[in-house]
């Protein structure tokens, strides 16, 4: 789909007059999805335990509370769920604070959005403190006007509420905002609500890339591909 920037510094994608962008963070701006698959195994190895084959897949679909309970019941009966949860949270924090890197092309894309006159916000399921520290360390935080988290909004991305809050904060209607997501369920939520959507590939992300591509208005394997639409 062709993109142009008109005389009023608005990005026009086909019939869409795009004024603002909402970025997901994990798997879109940050190369962080791997930790969510490996966290349980990393923790068990630190505890001197050998993780089972397929543990990452088992835990990936669980909430933090469910995963903690699973690790206690199957590996660490002598540790309390609170102790296990604290250990997992500490490892997760350290990863975001000191290890995670931006995805290739993230800063260039954010800069291009800013230079095109687009308003930029972010919507994430991760803790604010982790995300802000990781974005700051990678030089990305300054490009984002405001970050919205599921915990603070009170809804998961199965609801469009987090996108609606971000759009309202920018002063735009849904059809004036583009949402970038790497997960199918979140992208489907945004699309059903009337947002323009971009599906982003991540090797540790959505297993059904075919449906992600079919659902999105635009699908890219690399963030750099979007620069061709903006520059």
Residue ranges and their predicted role:
Residues 2-116:
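N-terminal helical cap/lid subdomain that shapes the substrate entry/recognition surface
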Residues 28, 124-126:
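Conserved phosphate-coupling serine/threonine residues in phosphotransfer and NTP-handling enzymes
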Residues 1-19, 111-114, 127-128, 132-231:
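Asp-based, Mg2+/Mn2+-dependent phosphohydrolase catalytic module
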Residues 96-101, 125, 197-199:
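Short, flexible loop segments at the rims of nucleotide/cofactor-binding pockets, characterized by
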């Amino acid at each position: 789909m062709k993109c142009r920037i008109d005389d009023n510094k608005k990005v026009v994608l086909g019939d869409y007059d795009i004024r603002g962008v909402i970025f997901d963070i994990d798997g879109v701006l940050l190369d962080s999805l791997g930790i969510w698959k490996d966290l349980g195994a990393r923790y068990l190895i630190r505890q001197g335990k050998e993780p089972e084959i397929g543990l990452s897949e088992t835990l990936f679909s669980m909430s933090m509370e469910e995963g903690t309970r699973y690790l206690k019941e199957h590996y660490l009966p002598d540790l309390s769920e609170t102790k296990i949860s604290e250990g997992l949270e500490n490892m997760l924090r350290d990863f975001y604070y000191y290890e995670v890197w931006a995805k290739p092309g993230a800063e260039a894309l954010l800069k291009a959005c800013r230079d095109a006159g687009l308003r930029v916000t972010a919507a994430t399921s991760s803790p604010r403190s982790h995300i802000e520290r990781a974005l700051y360390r990678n030089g990305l935080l300054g490009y984002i006007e405001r970050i919205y988290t599921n915990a603070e909004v009170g809804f998961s991305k199965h609801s469009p509420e987090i996108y609606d809050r971000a759009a309202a904060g920018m002063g735009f209607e849904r059809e004036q905002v583009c949402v970038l997501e790497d997960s199918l369920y979140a992208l489907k939520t945004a699309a059903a609500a009337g947002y323009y959507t971009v599906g982003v590939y991540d090797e540790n992300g959505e297993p059904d890339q075919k449906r992600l591509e079919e659902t999105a208005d635009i699908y890219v394997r690399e963030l750099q591909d979007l620069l061709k639409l903006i520059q």
